[in-house]
Amino acid sequence: MHGLGRQILTGKLRPGQVVPVPADVSRTALREALKVLTAKGLVEARPRVGTRVRPRSDWQLFDTDVIAWQRGGALGAAFLNELTEIREILEPATAALAARRATADDIAEISRAYDDMVAATSSRGARALNVAAFVDADSRFHAGIVRASGNELLTQLGQTVFSALVLSFRATTKRPGAARASLPRHRAILNAIKRRHPADARRAMLSLMAHTAREVHRIEAPQ
């Protein structure tokens, strides 16, 4: 299943193409794999035609496996760009709501996440950045802001795109210096939420989203 999924998501198998039958896979295993891929909107079976790759518009793009399979491919770069556009639309408004509605516990949670981000960029020795720790803390920072918004629909939407956000965090954190450069922007968001200044929180998040967009464009640009 994972092998076929990666071939589809990285463009090796294109929409309309017949899905090949691997010689080393049993019929039972293949049938189960195709059942899962069908549920994710990636393939469809037709009588006398076989199983073909469905159009990208049918794919469940926020599915955890679908997100994982497209890492490193051209479609992954396009997905990161589109995800950044979604974040630019949603996260500034979310930060403004959090500045109005965050409880003391919410603020403490966001603050802890920020402190952990700082700690992850202050590793001693050869490793100047603990990428895994930074990504985890960055994820908790943004998830905490979504919860602090007090909007249940927005919170559920945030849970839906969480796996995709982790992909974005991992991609933009790997560039040397990018994580540390983002810290002042995260701090500005936290301070605005603490001070209960929705307009400042919105502006600070917009600044962070602009920074993120630049990092995504650097990833996409030829080296």
Show the residue positions of the predicted features.
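Short linear motifs at protein or domain termini
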Residues: 1-89, 96, 222-223
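Conserved amphipathic alpha-helical segments that form helical-bundle/coiled-coil interaction surfaces
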Residues: 83-171, 183-191, 200-215
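Generic C-terminal helix-cap and adjacent flexible tail
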Residues: 214-223
